[in-house]
C-alpha cells in the first residue's frame, strides 16, 4: 500500500496502485471532531473567597457601610477622653492598643466612693464605600460565517469563549483591587519601597513568620480549620492556616526555603491533603500559610532596582528587578458588589442578535451582520484592610 503524499495533503492515494484518484483532490483533508477542542476554563482563584453584595435598584451606584472602631484601639481617636482623676486626656480610648503592663494599670477606669465626672470615653466610626462600574464588549459576525464555516457550532463556541473572557476580566479586576487594598505591606530585607527592591529583597521563612504575627495582632481570622492526620499516608498536621496567593514564578523560591532550624520549610500538599479540604490551586504549606499558585497572578515588571551583575539569578525586565506579590487574604476581609445578582456570583447579561430581520436597518439593509454583546456590573468594597497582607519580593529563575 502506497504511503500518503506529505507534499499534497489533498491527494487521495489509490490503495492498490498508488495513483491519484480521477475524482480530483479532496476539500476536507482532516477529520474534525464535532465538539471543538476548547481550553479549560480558568479557575476563579480569588472569587472563591468573595461574597457578592446585591445592590438594590434606585439607590445609585455607590454603597456605604459604617465600620465602628473598637474602644481599646489606637485607631479610636476622639476628643471625649476624661481619665479617672477627671483630667482631660488626648484620646478617649483609655489605653488603646497598648499591651504594656504599666500603661494598662495606670489607665484603668477606677471609681471612688462618690463617683464623679470621670472615665469618659468616645467612639469613632469610618465609612467604607464601594462603587459599581459597568463593563462590556461585543463581536460582529456575518450570516455566511454561520452557513459555510466548517464548525457547525461556531456561534456556540465563540459565545462560550466570550463568557470565559468576561469571567477572567472580573477575576483580574478583583485581583487588582485586592493588591491595592492591602493594609499590611512588607518588604523582605532593607527595602522600604518598590524602587529599592534588589536581590536581597527575597522572601524568607522569617518574613512569613513575622507577617503571620502582624495578622494575628490585627485579629485577622484564619480561614481554614485544623487538619488532622490520617493513617493512609505520612501526614503532617497543619494548624489553622491562611491562604497565601502567589504566581508560579515563586515556586523555586518557596521550595528552596529553609526554616529557622535549617530544615525545608515547604510542606507539599500530598503530605496533608488526605486529612482535609484544600484550596483551588494549592500546592503546599509554609508555617501558618497555605500556598496557592495562581497562573494569572500579576506582578510589577522592572519596578525594582537595576540588576546587579553579581546577583542576576532573579526575574527582571529591562535590566531591573521585577517585583512579585505574595497576597494573604483573611476571611470576610472584603466583598464584591453585584447588581441584579443571586448574591453568590457576578451576573452577565448577554445579547445575541443573529443576522436577519432583527438586525436589518439602513446601515445594514440586507441583514447580513449579526452581533453578540456581553455586559456586567462589578464593584469592590474592602471591610478590613488590616486583614489583607502583601509581601513584595523578587523571584528566583
Swiss-Prot record:
A Pfam family the protein falls into: Phage_capsid_4
Manganese as UniProt keyword: no
Signal peptide positions (record): none
Keyword annotations of the record: Capsid protein, Virion
Annotated stretches, region: Disordered: 1-24
The keyword Cytoplasm belongs to this UniProt entry's keyword annotation: no
Purpose: Assembles to form an icosahedral capsid.
Name the UniProt record assigns to this protein: Major capsid protein
Species the sequence originates in: Pseudomonas phage KPP21
Source taxonomy: Viruses, Duplodnaviria, Heunggongvirae, Uroviricota, Caudoviricetes
Amino acid at each position: 500500500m502506497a504511503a500518503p503524499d506529505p507534499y499534497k495533503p489533498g491527494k487521495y492515494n489509490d490503495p492498490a496502485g498508488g495513483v491519484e484518484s480521477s475524482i480530483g483532490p479532496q476539500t476536507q483533508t482532516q477529520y474534525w471532531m464535532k465538539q471543538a477542542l476548547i481550553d479549560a476554563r480558568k479557575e476563579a482563584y480569588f472569587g472563591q473567597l468573595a461574597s457578592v453584595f446585591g445592590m438594590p435598584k434606585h439607590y445609585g451606584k455607590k454603597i456605604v457601610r459604617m465600620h465602628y472602631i473598637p474602644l481599646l484601639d489606637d485607631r479610636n481617636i476622639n476628643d471625649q477622653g476624661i481619665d479617672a482623676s477627671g483630667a482631660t486626656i488626648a484620646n478617649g480610648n483609655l489605653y488603646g492598643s497598648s499591651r504594656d503592663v504599666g500603661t494598662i494599670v495606670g489607665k484603668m477606669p477606677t471609681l471612688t466612693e462618690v463617683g464623679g465626672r470621670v472615665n469618659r470615653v468616645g467612639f469613632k466610626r469610618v465609612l467604607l464605600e464601594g462603587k459599581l462600574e459597568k463593563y462590556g464588549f461585543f463581536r460582529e459576525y456575518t450570516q455566511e460565517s454561520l452557513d459555510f464555516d466548517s464548525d457547525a457550532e461556531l456561534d456556540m463556541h465563540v459565545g462560550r469563549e466570550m463568557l470565559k473572557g468576561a469571567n477572567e476580566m472580573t477575576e483580574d479586576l478583583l485581583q487588582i483591587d485586592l493588591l491595592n487594598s492591602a493594609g499590611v505591606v512588607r518588604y523582605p530585607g532593607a527595602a522600604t519601597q518598590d524602587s529599592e527592591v534588589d536581590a536581597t529583597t527575597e522572601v524568607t521563612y522569617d518574613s512569613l513568620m513575622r507577617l503571620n504575627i502582624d495578622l494575628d495582632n490585627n485579629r485577622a481570622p484564619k480561614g481554614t480549620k485544623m487538619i488532622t492526620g490520617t493513617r493512609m499516608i505520612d501526614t503532617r498536621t497543619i494548624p489553622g492556616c491562611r491562604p497565601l496567593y502567589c504566581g508560579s514564578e515563586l515556586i523555586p523560591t518557596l521550595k528552596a526555603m529553609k526554616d529557622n532550624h535549617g530544615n525545608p520549610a515547604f510542606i507539599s500538599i500530598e503530605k496533608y491533603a488526605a486529612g482535609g479540604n484544600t484550596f483551588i490551586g494549592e500546592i503546599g504549606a509554609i508555617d501558618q500559610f497555605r500556598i496557592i499558585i495562581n497562573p494569572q497572578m500579576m506582578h510589577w515588571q522592572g519596578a525594582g532596582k537595576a540588576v546587579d551583575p553579581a546577583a542576576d539569578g532573579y526575574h527582571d525586565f529591562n535590566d531591573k528587578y521585577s517585583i512579585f506579590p505574595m497576597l494573604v487574604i483573611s476571611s470576610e476581609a472584603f466583598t464584591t458588589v453585584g447588581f441584579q445578582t443571586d448574591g453568590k456570583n457576578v451576573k452577565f447579561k448577554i445579547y445575541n442578535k443573529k443576522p436577519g430581520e432583527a438586525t436589518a436597518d439602513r446601515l445594514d439593509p440586507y441583514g447580513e451582520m449579526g452581533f453578540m454583546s456581553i455586559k456586567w456590573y462589578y464593584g469592590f468594597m474592602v471591610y478590613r484592610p488590616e486583614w489583607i497582607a502583601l509581601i513584595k519580593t523578587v523571584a528566583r529563575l
